From Swiss-Prot:
Pfam family, one: FTHFS
Pathway(s) the chain acts in: One-carbon metabolism; tetrahydrofolate interconversion
Name listed for the protein in its UniProt record: Formate--tetrahydrofolate ligase
Gene: fhs
Keyword annotations of the record: ATP-binding, Ligase, Nucleotide-binding, One-carbon metabolism
PROSITE patterns documented for this protein: FTHFS_2 (PS00722)
EC number per UniProt: 6.3.4.3
Length: 585
């Protein structure tokens, strides 16, 4: 690999206003690139439209799916979304029909530390502010549907306790006998708000409801978000929502959304969410955005329907899995592929020189603090240490049976010596290719070499090999993944053990796992950097997502409601008199 890099002076100033300076095409002019007509679109303004899923055909030629993952994330960012968008642009420049599939950003990270998720520079989704803030309203619809079920639970609990046996006489409905201590369905909001992690509802008693302890989660953690991402049709979504276990009765029986009589109304609120949203990149190429489950506390992939639509309409679909290969990629194979049969042809692992050095574990990197000179300057020994993390992720991706291409997300001042070392290391570690990506600086022009490598790698695809069989016990599945992570043993709290036994007894032992853990380490301990070995994986809680079709395994102290830091992104966001939003990234 002999990279030719632009200087920062040549590139970066012209990118600062990319979002506002790019000439956007009407979305009706983007759709024909995928063979879509105006009749296939449900317009949302000039530059966004939902694609009616009636455009899906039951059979026909299928494109190839490229799954983008990364090394263990660092506060520096690896540029996975930039690479995903840039790679799709590069594929289009090579004369193929390419489309990217990404998740809808949550407002929590947008206003928190991470910021938006539109990509950046010359490889981003536009209009960026529409993507990052509301898009077509799917997350709000999910929040409304989720909170309707929560309100219905508390209302039924209140009325049954108030009326007793008279409730059935008045309503003709059976008593559910909801156990107030076994309500499993919290409320949600699409913000980071740590003050809502522990709350009391029904305070005041009497007509105010039944007082009980509860909590609020971020909408991206809602089972409804996972259901949207995994559904094959509106009918499938309705059936899945009906299977959600909301609570248990005083006799221990599961109470579902269908039992509560709220599943139909929830689905009605989410009706329009079933259609993926079409937007454009900074090079006026198509992007499909659909669903937004986090990869640390959920399964971390965009929707089955978006992928299916892309595979029907394009030669190559570039889809992104959240966080490192131990998170979103693992869940793609063991949950999304297992349920849908959608098969990637290649895995792309994104890394940067800086993040590899940070993964060495030598430095404690914190957001907003100056980087040590050793990370910014040429330092082959430090890079070599951090490359052990890359090797682990290459081997992890290869364990699923697919070819792996390493994409080096390049900075203008990256050392050619370090880039050459990294290319040699990646190939010796088992990657089929290693290529730089200058997507941020050059868009598709900076990714054509990478795109060709990826297209070539797709020719070597074979059926994926899953980490564990369906008929393994839940404990066996946990142990298999823990061993892959490098754990010495798995421990279970008494609560987790009881929950695991109950889930198995209820007939859900065949389901795949969704491990909720820190994304900042291959282990469940964020302080264990690089490639941890011989650690203990602590399972603290387990729960079944019967509608989504997986069992959630909480490893360590996992928060399903993030908090805001001391310097959240909202400090930098404002709007001018013409309505132009500034500071959103």
């Amino acid at each position: 690999m002999t990279p030719t890099l632009s200087s920062s002076a040549d590139v970066l100033p012209s990118l600062s206003n990319m979002s506002s300076e790019t000439n956007l095409l009407p979305i009706q002019q983007i759709a024909p690139q995928l063979g879509l007509s105006a009749d296939d679109l449900i317009p949302y303004g000039h530059h966004m439209a939902k694609v009616d899923i009636s455009a899906l055909r039951p059979s026909g030629p299928q494109g190839k799916l490229i799954l983008v993952s990364s090394i263990t994330p660092t506060p520096l960012g690896e540029g996975k979304t930039v690479t995903t968008i840039g790679l799709s642009q590069g594929i289009n420049r090579l004369g193929y029909r390419g489309v990217a599939c990404i998740r809808q950003p949550s407002l929590g990270p947008v206003f928190g530390v991470k910021g938006g998720a539109a990509g950046g520079g010359a490889a981003q989704v536009l209009p960026m502010e529409k993507l990052n803030l509301h898009l077509t309203g799917d997350i709000h619809a999910i929040s409304a549907a989720h909170n309707l079920a929560a309100a219905a639970l508390d209302a039924r609990l209140y009325h049954e306790q108030r009326l007793g046996a008279v409730f059935s006489q008045q309503t003709g409905m059976p008593l559910l006998n909801i156990d107030a201590q076994q309500i499993l369905w919290p409320r949600v909001v699409d913000h980071n708000d740590r003050a809502l992690r522990h709350i009391q509802v029904g305070v005041g008693g009497g007509t105010h409801g039944v007082e009980r302890h509860d909590h609020v989660e971020i909408t991206a953690a809602s089972e409804l978000m996972a259901i949207l991402a995994l559904s094959e049709s509106l009918h499938d979504m309705r059936q899945r929502i009906g299977r959600i276990i909301l609570a248990h009765s005083t006799s221990g029986q599961a109470i579902t959304a269908d039992d509560l009589g709220v599943a139909g109304a929830m689905t009605a609120l989410m009706k329009e969410t079933i259609h993926p949203t079409l937007m454009q990149t900074s090079e006026q190429t198509p992007v499909l955005i659909h669903a937004g489950p986090f990869a640390n506390i959920a399964h971390g992939n965009s929707s089955v329907l978006a992928d299916r639509l892309g595979l029907q309409l394009a030669d190559y679909v570039v889809t992104e899995a959240g966080f490192g290969s131990d998170m979103g990629m693992e869940k793609f194979f063991n949950i999304k592929y297992r349920q849908s049969g959608i098969t990637p042809s290649c895995v792309v692992l994104v890394a940067t020189l800086r993040s590899l050095k940070a993964n060495s574990g030598v430095f404690d990197i914190k957001p907003g603090q100056p980087l040590p000179a050793e990370i910014l300057n040429t330092n082959i020994p430090l890079l070599s240490q951090g490359c052990a993390n890359l090797k682990w992720h290459i081997n992890n991706a290869k364990s699923y049976g697919l070819p792996v291409v390493v994409a080096v997300n390049c900075f203008p001042d990256d050392s050619p010596e370090e880039l050459a070392f990294l290319a040699d290391y990646a190939l010796s570690a088992g990657a089929i290719a290693c290529e730089i990506s200058e997507a941020f600086a050059k868009g598709g022009a900076g990714t054509t070499a990478l795109a060709q490598r990826v297209i070539d790698a797709c020719a070597h695809a074979s059926p994926p090999v899953l980490a564990y069989p369906d008929n393994a016990s839940l404990e066996q599945k946990i142990e298999i993944l823990a061993q892959r992570y490098g754990a010495r043993e798995v421990t279970f709290t008494p609560q987790a053990r009881q929950q695991l036994d109950s889930i198995t007894a209820a007939g859900f032992g065949h389901l795949p796992l969704c491990i909720a853990k820190t994304p900042l380490s291959i282990s469940a301990d964020a302080s264990l950097k690089n490639v941890p070995h011989d650690f203990v994986l602590p399972v603290t809680a387990c729960a079944v997502s019967a509608g989504a079709g997986f069992v959630r395994i909480y490893a360590g102290d996992i928060m399903t409601m993030p908090g805001l830091g001391t310097q959240p992104a909202y400090y930098h966001i404002d709007i001018d008199d013409e309505g132009c939003i500034r500071g959103l990234s």
